[in-house]
From Swiss-Prot:
Top-level taxon of origin: Bacteria
Gene that this sequence comes from: coaX2
Major site of localization recorded for this protein: cytoplasm
Enzyme class at the top of the EC tree: transferase
Keyword Metal-binding in annotation: yes
HAMAP family in the record: Pantothen_kinase_3 (MF_01274)
Cofactor-binding details, from the entry: A monovalent cation. Ammonium or potassium.
Pfam families tied to this protein: Pan_kinase
Reaction catalysis annotation: (R)-pantothenate + ATP = (R)-4'-phosphopantothenate + ADP + H(+)
Gene3D superfamilies the UniProt entry points to: 3.30.420.40
GO MF terms held by the record: ATP binding; metal ion binding; pantothenate kinase activity
Record-given protein name: Type III pantothenate kinase 2
Keyword Kinase among record annotations: yes
Length: 264
């Protein structure tokens, strides 16, 4: 059984695979102040509630957008699972060529999502990750990572409105009944939900013009914590796949293992 852990700036998503099947998935708050033991107890308890034991885990793969947490999770894996995890980063074979000025600048989560998306949907392709930031990544028809766009996420933007506009309340991030709002809460929800959907559609169209100028068929897939909330509001998004990064971790782990066996 493979345990996959995707550490984002706001949330950490974990899942267990048996072969290609995702058996269970959990989302917890990312907290750099948690200790190795706190993370160990958290993951083992979540697994136990789903009917799994730590002894069933034979491998761990990690992608992290929070570098200080990597050593904590590595120690946690060694203590609670008796395993050395595969941490996706420079030097790990992903099977994807990275066409970026400095490949080391690209976050592991972006590459992991791109690998899974190309494997599942083919290219050319744009991956829209609705997380702490909204990140759009482009993959060529040949499976090359070409770069992308980073914009503020909806939670960050909503919090900024609450913090810096004295009369605006903190609002629940849900779809309002209409775009033309008749109260402040709905007006903020309209601006956030419909506004960011329009932002994504415009960015996708601009990227498509460069990625697929002949219009042969560029696919667009959404992932991330807010994917299910926003994907349906975006005219350009064709697929919604919230578990994309976990799938990418599985694929990269399998490729890494295949390369290690071939190298012996």
């Amino acid at each position: 059984m493979l345990l996959t852990i995707d550490v984002g700036n706001t949330f950490t998503v974990a899942g267990v695979f048996e072969g290609q099947n995702l058996l269970a998935e959990w989302t917890v708050t990312t907290d750099p102040n948690r200790t190795m033991d706190e993370y160990g107890m958290l993951f083992t308890q979540l697994m136990a509630r789903a009917g799994f034991s730590s002894g069933q885990v034979t491998a761990v793969a990690i992608a992290s957008s929070v570098p200080p947490l990597v050593p904590t999770l590595e120690w946690m894996c060694q203590k609670y699972f008796n395993l050395k995890p595969l941490v996706v980063g420079p030097g790990v074979r992903t099977g994807m060529m990275i066409r970026y000025d400095n490949p080391r600048e690209v976050g592991a989560d972006r590459i992991v999502g791109a690998v899974a998306a190309f494997d599942k949907y083919g290219g050319p392709l744009i991956v829209v990750d609705f997380s702490t930031a909204i990140i759009l990544d482009a993959i060529s028809a040949r499976g090359e990572y070409l770069g992308g766009v980073i914009a503020p996420g909806i939670v960050v933007s909503a919090d900024a409105l609450f913090q810096f506009a004295a009369k605006l309340p903190r609002v629940e991030l849900v779809r309002p009944p209409r775009a033309l709002a008749r109260n402040t809460v709905h007006a903020m929800q309209s601006g956030i939900i419909f506004g960011f959907a329009s932002l994504v559609d415009d960015l996708v169209e601009r990227m498509m013009a460069e990625l697929d100028p002949e219009g042969k068929g560029c696919k667009v897939v959404a992932t991330g914590e807010q994917a299910e909330l926003l994907a349906g509001e975006c005219a350009t998004i064709q697929y919604c796949d919230p578990s994309l990064t976990l799938t990418g971790l599985r694929i990269i782990y399998e490729r890494h293992q295949a390369h290690a066996r071939g190298g012996r």
